[in-house]
């Protein structure tokens, strides 16, 4: 399954997040999601904000968590870009 899909408001990106990592980085695929390591701890929304910041910096769109805010597997909505450009950003 592709981790990127079209959404009525832009593109949806499925991610598997590893908080508290030594650095923030994209690490390839984890099942049907893109694996992202963030250095921020999973406390007070810090890891979620680090993830949103990374996705925005990588894609150039506006990102928000669509589902999974308290889970390691999340779906991120990226406004202002299409699924094809998001796929190219994460290659």
What kind of feature is each model-predicted range?
Residues 1-53, 57-70, 74-91:
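Contiguous, often N-terminal, cationic amphipathic patches that form binding interfaces
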